[in-house]
From Swiss-Prot:
Keywords of this entry: Cytoplasm, Glycosyltransferase, Lipopolysaccharide biosynthesis, Transferase
Signal peptide coordinates: none
GO biological process, one term: lipopolysaccharide biosynthetic process
Protein species of origin: Mannheimia haemolytica
Disulphide bridges: none
Protein name from the UniProt record: Lipooligosaccharide biosynthesis protein LpsA
Length: 263
Protein backbone atom coordinates (compact mmCIF):
# COMPACT_ATOMS: atom_id res chain seq x y z
CA UNK A 1 0.00 0.00 0.00
CA UNK A 2 1.24 3.46 -0.92
CA UNK A 3 -1.04 5.66 1.18
CA UNK A 4 -0.09 9.31 1.57
CA UNK A 5 -1.94 11.96 3.57
CA UNK A 6 -1.26 15.59 2.67
CA UNK A 7 -0.96 17.63 5.85
CA UNK A 8 0.72 20.79 7.07
CA UNK A 9 3.46 20.08 9.60
CA UNK A 10 1.72 22.52 11.95
CA UNK A 11 -1.66 20.74 11.76
CA UNK A 12 -1.13 18.52 14.79
CA UNK A 13 -4.83 18.11 15.60
CA UNK A 14 -5.55 16.91 12.06
CA UNK A 15 -2.57 14.56 12.17
CA UNK A 16 -3.77 13.00 15.41
CA UNK A 17 -7.17 12.52 13.78
CA UNK A 18 -5.61 10.75 10.77
CA UNK A 19 -3.46 8.52 12.97
CA UNK A 20 -6.58 7.45 14.85
CA UNK A 21 -8.72 7.07 11.72
CA UNK A 22 -6.22 4.92 9.81
CA UNK A 23 -5.25 3.12 13.00
CA UNK A 24 -8.82 1.84 13.50
CA UNK A 25 -8.36 -0.43 10.47
CA UNK A 26 -4.58 -0.93 10.78
CA UNK A 27 -3.94 0.87 7.50
CA UNK A 28 -0.32 1.91 6.91
CA UNK A 29 0.24 5.45 5.65
CA UNK A 30 2.74 8.28 5.47
CA UNK A 31 2.22 11.98 6.00
CA UNK A 32 3.28 14.18 3.12
CA UNK A 33 4.20 17.65 4.30
CA UNK A 34 1.92 20.03 2.44
CA UNK A 35 3.49 22.76 0.35
CA UNK A 36 2.97 26.16 1.96
CA UNK A 37 2.09 29.42 0.16
CA UNK A 38 5.60 30.84 0.64
CA UNK A 39 7.00 28.02 -1.52
CA UNK A 40 4.56 28.07 -4.43
CA UNK A 41 6.78 29.96 -6.90
CA UNK A 42 9.72 27.65 -6.23
CA UNK A 43 7.64 24.46 -6.48
CA UNK A 44 5.67 25.60 -9.53
CA UNK A 45 8.94 26.25 -11.34
CA UNK A 46 10.28 22.83 -10.30
CA UNK A 47 7.16 21.13 -11.70
CA UNK A 48 7.08 23.34 -14.82
CA UNK A 49 3.66 24.76 -13.90
CA UNK A 50 2.74 28.28 -15.01
CA UNK A 51 0.98 30.24 -12.24
CA UNK A 52 1.72 33.72 -13.59
CA UNK A 53 -1.84 34.52 -14.71
CA UNK A 54 -3.93 32.56 -12.25
CA UNK A 55 -6.83 33.92 -10.20
CA UNK A 56 -6.45 31.17 -7.61
CA UNK A 57 -5.53 32.08 -4.06
CA UNK A 58 -2.08 31.20 -2.75
CA UNK A 59 -3.70 28.56 -0.57
CA UNK A 60 -5.41 26.95 -3.56
CA UNK A 61 -2.15 26.93 -5.51
CA UNK A 62 -0.28 25.39 -2.58
CA UNK A 63 -2.96 22.70 -2.27
CA UNK A 64 -2.72 21.88 -5.98
CA UNK A 65 1.08 21.73 -5.90
CA UNK A 66 0.96 19.35 -2.93
CA UNK A 67 -1.07 16.92 -5.02
CA UNK A 68 1.16 17.45 -8.05
CA UNK A 69 4.23 16.74 -5.90
CA UNK A 70 2.79 13.33 -5.04
CA UNK A 71 2.08 12.62 -8.71
CA UNK A 72 5.76 13.26 -9.41
CA UNK A 73 6.77 11.07 -6.47
CA UNK A 74 4.65 8.22 -7.87
CA UNK A 75 6.27 8.63 -11.28
CA UNK A 76 9.82 8.88 -9.91
CA UNK A 77 9.38 5.76 -7.77
CA UNK A 78 7.52 3.98 -10.58
CA UNK A 79 4.63 3.11 -8.25
CA UNK A 80 1.81 1.10 -9.78
CA UNK A 81 -0.64 3.00 -7.58
CA UNK A 82 -0.58 5.79 -5.04
CA UNK A 83 -3.49 6.57 -2.70
CA UNK A 84 -3.71 10.29 -1.91
CA UNK A 85 -5.75 11.72 0.95
CA UNK A 86 -6.24 15.04 2.69
CA UNK A 87 -6.07 15.26 6.46
CA UNK A 88 -9.71 15.89 7.39
CA UNK A 89 -11.24 12.67 6.05
CA UNK A 90 -13.07 9.76 7.61
CA UNK A 91 -12.77 6.26 6.16
CA UNK A 92 -15.64 3.87 5.47
CA UNK A 93 -15.98 0.14 5.98
CA UNK A 94 -13.42 -2.33 4.58
CA UNK A 95 -10.95 0.43 3.78
CA UNK A 96 -7.97 -1.88 4.35
CA UNK A 97 -9.14 -4.25 1.60
CA UNK A 98 -10.29 -1.52 -0.77
CA UNK A 99 -6.95 0.27 -0.64
CA UNK A 100 -5.07 -2.81 -1.87
CA UNK A 101 -5.86 -1.74 -5.46
CA UNK A 102 -5.59 -5.23 -7.02
CA UNK A 103 -9.18 -4.98 -8.26
CA UNK A 104 -8.77 -1.83 -10.36
CA UNK A 105 -9.57 -2.37 -14.08
CA UNK A 106 -6.83 -1.81 -16.64
CA UNK A 107 -6.49 1.55 -18.40
CA UNK A 108 -7.83 3.38 -15.35
CA UNK A 109 -6.24 6.73 -14.51
CA UNK A 110 -7.97 7.50 -11.20
CA UNK A 111 -10.37 5.84 -8.80
CA UNK A 112 -12.24 8.56 -6.89
CA UNK A 113 -12.94 7.40 -3.34
CA UNK A 114 -14.63 10.52 -2.04
CA UNK A 115 -18.09 11.99 -2.31
CA UNK A 116 -19.49 15.50 -1.93
CA UNK A 117 -23.21 16.25 -1.58
CA UNK A 118 -23.11 19.01 -4.20
CA UNK A 119 -22.73 17.19 -7.49
CA UNK A 120 -25.22 14.67 -8.86
CA UNK A 121 -24.16 11.79 -11.10
CA UNK A 122 -26.04 9.71 -13.67
CA UNK A 123 -27.65 6.81 -11.82
CA UNK A 124 -27.52 4.66 -14.98
CA UNK A 125 -23.75 4.80 -15.50
CA UNK A 126 -22.43 1.37 -16.45
CA UNK A 127 -20.82 -0.55 -13.60
CA UNK A 128 -17.28 -1.65 -14.49
CA UNK A 129 -16.51 -3.57 -11.30
CA UNK A 130 -18.15 -4.77 -8.08
CA UNK A 131 -15.99 -5.03 -4.97
CA UNK A 132 -17.16 -5.61 -1.37
CA UNK A 133 -20.70 -4.30 -1.95
CA UNK A 134 -19.44 -1.26 -3.83
CA UNK A 135 -19.36 -0.53 -7.52
CA UNK A 136 -16.97 1.31 -9.77
CA UNK A 137 -18.36 3.26 -12.69
CA UNK A 138 -16.89 5.72 -15.17
CA UNK A 139 -17.27 9.30 -14.06
CA UNK A 140 -18.69 11.33 -16.94
CA UNK A 141 -19.77 14.50 -15.18
CA UNK A 142 -18.51 16.95 -12.58
CA UNK A 143 -17.91 15.52 -9.10
CA UNK A 144 -15.20 17.57 -7.44
CA UNK A 145 -13.08 17.12 -4.32
CA UNK A 146 -9.56 15.72 -3.95
CA UNK A 147 -9.74 14.47 -0.37
CA UNK A 148 -9.35 10.83 -1.41
CA UNK A 149 -8.39 9.10 -4.67
CA UNK A 150 -6.21 6.33 -6.07
CA UNK A 151 -3.89 7.41 -8.86
CA UNK A 152 -2.45 4.75 -11.16
CA UNK A 153 0.97 4.90 -12.79
CA UNK A 154 -0.76 5.64 -16.08
CA UNK A 155 -2.77 8.38 -14.42
CA UNK A 156 0.29 10.05 -12.92
CA UNK A 157 2.00 10.07 -16.31
CA UNK A 158 -1.11 11.50 -18.00
CA UNK A 159 -1.68 14.31 -15.48
CA UNK A 160 1.97 15.35 -15.32
CA UNK A 161 2.12 15.59 -19.11
CA UNK A 162 -1.11 17.55 -19.55
CA UNK A 163 -1.07 19.97 -16.61
CA UNK A 164 1.04 22.99 -17.53
CA UNK A 165 -0.99 25.89 -16.10
CA UNK A 166 -3.10 26.35 -12.97
CA UNK A 167 -6.12 28.51 -13.75
CA UNK A 168 -8.81 26.60 -11.88
CA UNK A 169 -8.73 24.51 -8.67
CA UNK A 170 -7.06 21.14 -8.94
CA UNK A 171 -10.27 19.19 -8.27
CA UNK A 172 -12.10 21.08 -11.03
CA UNK A 173 -9.30 20.10 -13.39
CA UNK A 174 -9.09 16.38 -12.72
CA UNK A 175 -12.75 15.73 -11.89
CA UNK A 176 -14.46 18.03 -14.38
CA UNK A 177 -12.34 19.75 -17.05
CA UNK A 178 -10.24 16.71 -18.02
CA UNK A 179 -13.29 14.43 -18.14
CA UNK A 180 -13.88 15.88 -21.62
CA UNK A 181 -10.76 14.04 -22.83
CA UNK A 182 -11.87 10.72 -24.29
CA UNK A 183 -8.88 8.61 -23.21
CA UNK A 184 -8.95 9.93 -19.63
CA UNK A 185 -10.67 7.37 -17.41
CA UNK A 186 -11.85 8.19 -13.89
CA UNK A 187 -13.82 5.60 -11.96
CA UNK A 188 -16.04 6.62 -9.05
CA UNK A 189 -16.49 4.29 -6.09
CA UNK A 190 -20.06 4.06 -4.81
CA UNK A 191 -20.80 4.11 -1.94
CA UNK A 192 -17.78 6.31 -1.39
CA UNK A 193 -14.96 5.12 0.85
CA UNK A 194 -14.11 8.48 2.39
CA UNK A 195 -15.71 11.80 3.19
CA UNK A 196 -14.45 15.10 4.56
CA UNK A 197 -15.18 16.26 8.08
CA UNK A 198 -17.26 19.28 7.06
CA UNK A 199 -19.56 16.98 5.08
CA UNK A 200 -19.99 14.31 7.74
CA UNK A 201 -20.34 16.50 10.81
CA UNK A 202 -22.80 19.33 11.27
CA UNK A 203 -20.26 21.00 13.57
CA UNK A 204 -16.95 21.09 11.72
CA UNK A 205 -14.02 19.82 13.76
CA UNK A 206 -11.30 21.19 11.49
CA UNK A 207 -11.52 24.78 10.31
CA UNK A 208 -10.20 25.27 6.77
CA UNK A 209 -8.72 28.58 5.68
CA UNK A 210 -8.49 27.12 2.16
CA UNK A 211 -12.26 26.67 1.97
CA UNK A 212 -12.76 30.22 3.27
CA UNK A 213 -10.34 31.65 0.67
CA UNK A 214 -11.99 29.67 -2.11
CA UNK A 215 -15.45 30.85 -1.06
CA UNK A 216 -14.35 34.49 -1.12
CA UNK A 217 -12.73 34.10 -4.56
CA UNK A 218 -15.80 32.33 -5.97
CA UNK A 219 -18.14 34.99 -4.58
CA UNK A 220 -16.06 37.75 -6.16
CA UNK A 221 -15.99 35.92 -9.51
CA UNK A 222 -19.76 35.35 -9.35
CA UNK A 223 -20.34 39.07 -8.77
CA UNK A 224 -18.28 39.92 -11.85
CA UNK A 225 -20.13 37.32 -13.94
CA UNK A 226 -23.54 38.57 -12.76
CA UNK A 227 -22.64 42.16 -13.60
CA UNK A 228 -21.60 41.06 -17.09
CA UNK A 229 -24.87 39.15 -17.54
CA UNK A 230 -26.93 42.22 -16.67
CA UNK A 231 -25.32 44.08 -19.55
CA UNK A 232 -26.22 41.40 -22.09
CA UNK A 233 -29.20 41.98 -24.42
CA UNK A 234 -32.29 39.87 -23.67
CA UNK A 235 -30.96 39.15 -20.15
CA UNK A 236 -34.39 39.27 -18.51
CA UNK A 237 -36.01 37.18 -21.26
CA UNK A 238 -33.33 34.53 -20.81
CA UNK A 239 -33.85 34.60 -17.04
CA UNK A 240 -37.61 34.05 -17.44
CA UNK A 241 -36.99 31.13 -19.80
CA UNK A 242 -34.63 29.54 -17.28
CA UNK A 243 -37.17 29.89 -14.48
CA UNK A 244 -39.89 28.30 -16.63
CA UNK A 245 -37.58 25.39 -17.46
CA UNK A 246 -36.44 24.90 -13.83
CA UNK A 247 -39.23 22.45 -12.75
CA UNK A 248 -38.52 20.20 -15.76
CA UNK A 249 -34.79 20.30 -15.04
CA UNK A 250 -35.41 19.34 -11.41
CA UNK A 251 -37.66 16.45 -12.46
CA UNK A 252 -35.03 15.22 -14.91
CA UNK A 253 -32.37 15.34 -12.19
CA UNK A 254 -34.58 13.42 -9.78
CA UNK A 255 -35.27 10.65 -12.31
CA UNK A 256 -31.87 10.28 -13.96
CA UNK A 257 -29.33 11.40 -11.37
CA UNK A 258 -28.44 10.67 -7.77
CA UNK A 259 -25.99 11.56 -5.03
CA UNK A 260 -23.23 9.20 -3.96
CA UNK A 261 -23.49 8.07 -0.36
CA UNK A 262 -20.69 7.34 2.12
CA UNK A 263 -20.40 3.99 3.86
Amino acid sequence: MNNYVISLTSAQERRKHIEAEFGKQNIPFQFFDAITPDLIKEKAKAFNIDISNTNLTKGEIACALSHIALWHLAKQQNLDYICIFEDDIYLGNNAFELLKTNYIPENTHIVKLETLPFDRINRFNKTEKYILNRRLFKLNSRHVGTAGYILTNKGAEFLINILKTLNIPIDDLIFDEYLKIKEYKVLQMSPALCVQDFILNSKTNFKSSLQDDRAIRCNNEDKIKNQAKLKKPNYFLTKIQKELYRPFKQLKQKVFTTYITFK
